[in-house]
């Protein structure tokens, strides 16, 4: 499974979320791949993923449809990782 965080340096909520996602990346390092995409530097990728707000986080399971969250809390992200990606 993969978690993709679309963020920007000028986005306050994005900057507050980064340390939380880094903690999650450490906690789940052997189970989930975490990626960060700087929206200002990767505009074409943002268009491909239809990014309209920041932060936007994609949770992509091995099987099934991706889950997209915009502006959710870190607690919600952990819930998605545990219940949807890792099926705990």
Regions found by a protein language model. Name each.
Residues 1-2, 28, 76:
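Preference for well-ordered, secondary-structure-rich cores of eukaryotic proteins
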Residues 11-14:
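Hydrophobic heptad-repeat coiled-coil signature
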Residues 43-44, 75:
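Acidic phosphotransfer microenvironment of two-component signaling modules
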């Amino acid at each position: 499974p993969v978690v993709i965080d679309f963020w920007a340096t000028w986005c306050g909520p994005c900057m507050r979320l980064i340390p939380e996602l880094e903690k999650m990346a450490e906690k789940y390092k052997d189970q989930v791949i975490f990626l960060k995409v700087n929206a200002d530097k990767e505009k074409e990728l943002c268009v491909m993923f239809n990014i309209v707000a920041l932060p936007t986080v994609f949770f992509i399971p091995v099987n099934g449809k991706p889950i997209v969250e915009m502006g959710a809390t870190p607690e919600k992200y952990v819930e998605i990782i545990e219940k949807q990606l890792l099926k705990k």
